[in-house]
């Protein structure tokens, strides 16, 4: 008769496991699924943002270069009277214009590095450059 009580205990344990799954397990299962879906959507959003940053930077650079904006700014700045040019040079306006017009992408990368993020290029296919935004903080938390 001991085998019968062991068998009934196994049946009761099975039904208890099913009851626990319906009581708490479904919630945990759905929550874990939503966590995975949220991680995937955040990753996709970051990858899309990186792609859009690359596309918009390239488009803006080509537009600015085709319109001749840097040459026009240099010629207009050279036409300024001496005291005004000296005042602007004191406040660093020429350097700011040079950064904006010449190396805007580098300034963006330096700003990202300042907040411990880095954009790295991951090329598996040279015709389609891919970028990866990487956190530079190495702390486990």
Curated annotation (Swiss-Prot):
It is found in: Virion; Host membrane. Plays essential roles both in the entry of the viral genome into the bacterial host and in budding process. The formation of the G3P-G6P complex termed adsorption complex is essential for correct termination of filamentous phage assembly. InterPro entries: DUF2523. One of its GO terms (cellular component) is host cell membrane. It comes from Pseudomonas phage Pf1 (Bacteriophage Pf1). Pfam families: DUF2523. This is Head virion protein G6P. Keywords: Host membrane, Membrane, Transmembrane, Transmembrane helix, Viral penetration into host cytoplasm, Viral penetration into host cytoplasm via pilus retraction, Virion, Virus entry into host cell. It is a multi-pass membrane protein. Interacts with G3P; this interaction is required for proper integration of G3P and G6P into the virion. The chain crosses the membrane at residues 3-23, 33-53, 80-100. The lineage of its organism: Viruses, Monodnaviria, Loebvirae, Hofneiviricota, Faserviricetes. One of its GO terms (biological process) is symbiont entry into host cell. Belongs to the inovirus G6P protein family. Its main location: virion.
């Amino acid at each position: 008769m001991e085998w019968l009580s062991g068998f009934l205990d196994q049946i009761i344990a099975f039904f208890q496991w099913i009851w626990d799954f319906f009581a708490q397990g479904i919630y945990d299962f759905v929550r874990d699924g939503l966590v995975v879906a949220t991680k995937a959507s955040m990753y996709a959003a970051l990858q899309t943002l990186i792609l859009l940053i690359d596309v918009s930077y390239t488009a803006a650079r080509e537009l600015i270069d085709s319109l001749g904006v840097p040459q026009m700014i240099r010629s207009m700045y050279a036409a300024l009277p001496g005291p005004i040019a000296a005042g602007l040079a004191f406040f660093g306006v020429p350097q700011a214009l040079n950064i904006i017009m010449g190396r805007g992408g580098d300034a963006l990368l330096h700003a990202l590095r300042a907040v411990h993020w880095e954009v790295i290029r991951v090329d598996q296919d040279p015709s389609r450059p891919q970028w990866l935004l990487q956190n530079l903080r190495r702390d486990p938390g």
